Amino acid sequence: MMNDNLTVNNTNKSAGEQILEQFLKFMLEKDMDKWIDLWDEHAIFEFPFGPSNYPEKIEGRSNIYNYIKDFPKKITLFKFSIPQIHHTLNSNILIAEFKCEGQIINTGLPYKQKYISVIEISNGKISHYKDYWNPLVAIESFGGNLATFLDSSPNLKQ
Protein backbone atom coordinates (compact mmCIF):
# COMPACT_ATOMS: atom_id res chain seq x y z
CA MET A 1 0.00 0.00 0.00
CA MET A 2 1.43 3.36 -1.02
CA ASN A 3 0.98 6.48 1.07
CA ASP A 4 2.33 9.93 0.39
CA ASN A 5 0.93 11.36 3.62
CA LEU A 6 3.73 10.35 5.95
CA THR A 7 3.31 11.26 9.60
CA VAL A 8 6.32 13.12 10.97
CA ASN A 9 7.29 13.39 14.66
CA ASN A 10 5.04 10.62 15.93
CA THR A 11 6.14 10.14 19.55
CA ASN A 12 5.66 6.36 19.27
CA LYS A 13 8.41 6.15 16.67
CA SER A 14 12.14 6.00 17.20
CA ALA A 15 14.36 8.93 16.23
CA GLY A 16 15.54 6.91 13.24
CA GLU A 17 11.98 6.28 12.06
CA GLN A 18 11.14 9.97 12.41
CA ILE A 19 14.24 10.95 10.44
CA LEU A 20 13.38 8.42 7.71
CA GLU A 21 9.87 9.88 7.44
CA GLN A 22 11.35 13.36 7.04
CA PHE A 23 13.87 11.97 4.52
CA LEU A 24 11.04 10.59 2.36
CA LYS A 25 8.82 13.65 2.86
CA PHE A 26 11.56 16.04 1.70
CA MET A 27 12.24 13.82 -1.32
CA LEU A 28 8.57 14.03 -2.30
CA GLU A 29 8.62 17.79 -1.78
CA LYS A 30 11.85 18.08 -3.81
CA ASP A 31 13.38 20.03 -0.92
CA MET A 32 16.99 18.95 -1.11
CA ASP A 33 18.11 21.69 1.31
CA LYS A 34 15.94 20.29 4.11
CA TRP A 35 16.82 16.74 3.04
CA ILE A 36 20.57 17.36 3.36
CA ASP A 37 20.08 18.91 6.81
CA LEU A 38 19.11 15.43 8.03
CA TRP A 39 22.70 14.27 7.41
CA ASP A 40 25.74 14.46 9.67
CA GLU A 41 28.65 16.50 8.32
CA HIS A 42 30.78 13.34 8.00
CA ALA A 43 28.02 11.01 6.81
CA ILE A 44 28.53 8.12 4.42
CA PHE A 45 25.98 7.26 1.70
CA GLU A 46 26.63 3.77 0.28
CA PHE A 47 25.27 1.99 -2.80
CA PRO A 48 26.33 -1.67 -2.43
CA PHE A 49 24.40 -2.78 -5.54
CA GLY A 50 25.10 0.20 -7.81
CA PRO A 51 26.06 -0.53 -11.43
CA SER A 52 29.64 -0.42 -12.68
CA ASN A 53 31.07 3.11 -12.85
CA TYR A 54 28.68 4.18 -10.07
CA PRO A 55 30.30 5.09 -6.76
CA GLU A 56 30.16 2.52 -4.00
CA LYS A 57 29.95 5.32 -1.46
CA ILE A 58 29.89 9.07 -1.10
CA GLU A 59 31.53 10.57 1.96
CA GLY A 60 30.67 13.89 3.59
CA ARG A 61 27.48 15.94 3.64
CA SER A 62 28.72 18.40 0.99
CA ASN A 63 29.55 15.56 -1.44
CA ILE A 64 26.18 13.92 -0.73
CA TYR A 65 24.49 17.24 -1.47
CA ASN A 66 26.38 17.56 -4.78
CA TYR A 67 25.16 14.07 -5.65
CA ILE A 68 21.49 14.76 -4.81
CA LYS A 69 20.94 18.47 -5.53
CA ASP A 70 19.80 17.99 -9.14
CA PHE A 71 17.65 14.95 -8.37
CA PRO A 72 14.38 16.96 -8.68
CA LYS A 73 15.33 17.88 -12.27
CA LYS A 74 15.61 14.18 -13.19
CA ILE A 75 12.71 12.44 -11.48
CA THR A 76 9.31 13.27 -10.07
CA LEU A 77 8.43 11.06 -7.14
CA PHE A 78 4.72 10.52 -6.60
CA LYS A 79 4.70 8.48 -3.41
CA PHE A 80 6.50 6.15 -1.05
CA SER A 81 5.03 3.17 0.70
CA ILE A 82 4.90 3.21 4.47
CA PRO A 83 8.28 1.77 5.42
CA GLN A 84 8.43 -1.60 7.11
CA ILE A 85 10.92 -1.06 9.92
CA HIS A 86 13.20 -3.73 11.36
CA HIS A 87 14.93 -2.73 14.59
CA THR A 88 18.39 -4.02 15.36
CA LEU A 89 20.20 -4.74 18.61
CA ASN A 90 21.88 -1.36 18.16
CA SER A 91 19.16 1.24 18.81
CA ASN A 92 20.96 3.71 16.52
CA ILE A 93 20.59 1.43 13.48
CA LEU A 94 17.38 0.48 11.70
CA ILE A 95 16.55 -1.38 8.54
CA ALA A 96 13.72 -0.07 6.38
CA GLU A 97 11.95 -1.68 3.43
CA PHE A 98 9.88 0.59 1.21
CA LYS A 99 8.82 1.27 -2.37
CA CYS A 100 8.48 4.39 -4.43
CA GLU A 101 6.63 5.37 -7.56
CA GLY A 102 7.66 8.18 -9.82
CA GLN A 103 8.49 9.21 -13.36
CA ILE A 104 11.77 10.05 -15.07
CA ILE A 105 11.44 13.56 -16.46
CA ASN A 106 13.58 13.14 -19.62
CA THR A 107 12.13 9.79 -20.72
CA GLY A 108 8.60 10.02 -19.32
CA LEU A 109 9.03 6.41 -18.20
CA PRO A 110 7.71 5.18 -14.86
CA TYR A 111 10.08 4.62 -11.97
CA LYS A 112 8.98 1.91 -9.55
CA GLN A 113 11.76 1.04 -7.17
CA LYS A 114 12.05 -1.17 -4.10
CA TYR A 115 14.53 -0.24 -1.40
CA ILE A 116 16.10 -1.83 1.59
CA SER A 117 17.98 0.77 3.59
CA VAL A 118 20.26 0.30 6.57
CA ILE A 119 20.34 3.62 8.40
CA GLU A 120 22.55 4.66 11.29
CA ILE A 121 21.65 7.72 13.34
CA SER A 122 24.20 9.60 15.46
CA ASN A 123 23.40 12.76 17.40
CA GLY A 124 20.02 13.07 15.68
CA LYS A 125 21.46 12.95 12.14
CA ILE A 126 22.01 10.29 9.49
CA SER A 127 25.62 9.19 9.87
CA HIS A 128 25.58 6.17 7.57
CA TYR A 129 23.00 5.15 4.96
CA LYS A 130 23.33 1.94 2.96
CA ASP A 131 20.94 2.18 0.02
CA TYR A 132 20.12 -1.24 -1.45
CA TRP A 133 18.18 -0.54 -4.66
CA ASN A 134 17.88 -2.29 -8.00
CA PRO A 135 20.00 -0.47 -10.59
CA LEU A 136 18.28 -2.39 -13.41
CA VAL A 137 15.00 -0.62 -12.57
CA ALA A 138 16.73 2.76 -12.68
CA ILE A 139 18.58 2.01 -15.93
CA GLU A 140 15.35 0.83 -17.59
CA SER A 141 13.52 3.98 -16.45
CA PHE A 142 16.26 6.13 -17.96
CA GLY A 143 15.73 4.46 -21.34
CA GLY A 144 17.51 1.15 -20.89
CA ASN A 145 21.02 2.42 -21.44
CA LEU A 146 23.64 2.37 -18.66
CA ALA A 147 25.52 5.30 -20.21
CA THR A 148 22.34 7.41 -20.28
CA PHE A 149 21.67 6.57 -16.64
CA LEU A 150 25.23 7.45 -15.62
CA ASP A 151 25.14 10.64 -17.71
CA SER A 152 22.01 11.67 -15.78
CA SER A 153 24.21 11.94 -12.69
CA PRO A 154 27.17 14.14 -13.70
CA ASN A 155 27.89 14.94 -10.05
CA LEU A 156 28.96 11.37 -9.31
CA LYS A 157 32.61 11.00 -8.42
CA GLN A 158 34.18 7.67 -7.58
Residues covered by each model-derived region:
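Hydrophobic/aromatic beta-strand elements that line small-molecule binding cavities or substrate pockets
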Residues: 82-86, 114-119
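Short beta-strand edge/turn micro-motifs at domain boundaries
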Residues: 116-140
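A short hydrophobic beta-strand element
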Residues: 91-100
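Short, low-complexity N-terminal intrinsically disordered segments enriched in polar/charged residues
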Residues: 1-38, 148-158
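Short, cysteine-centered beta-strand-loop-beta hairpins and adjacent loop/turn segments enriched
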Residues: 102-112
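Short beta-strand segments enriched in hydrophobic/aromatic residues
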Residues: 39-40, 100-102, 117, 133
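A solvent-exposed, acidic/Ser-Thr-rich amphipathic alpha-helical stretch
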Residues: 40-89
